[in-house]
Amino acid sequence: VAQNIQLEVKYKMYVKIHETENKDIVAVCDEDLIGKKFEEKGLVLDVSEEFYKGEKMDEKRTLEIMKKADILNIVGEKSIDLASKNDIVSKMNIIKIKGIPHAQVF
């Protein structure tokens, strides 16, 4: 008996929590940007594995963590879009380096 199984493919993002004494810094990036570096007009966006490559999470879990973060560092179209749609980051705070959106939220 054959069964039709439909799997919902959700986009995953890397989420890494850097704990300090006073605040938690959360780094979020699109999975396809890990390890890449972008430079434009003296600005450098280094999506290093050390800082960004934490646990791969779906949008729901990523959003839960974003909402609780003291400081956010977000890179990539999908990650920024998730934060923007949920009023975590304002469009005014988003910069683009080589077309890659980036925002910091304090």
Region spans (language model):
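Short, surface-exposed linear patches
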Residues: V47-Y52, K68, I94-K98
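Short, compact, well-ordered microdomains
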Residues: N73-F106
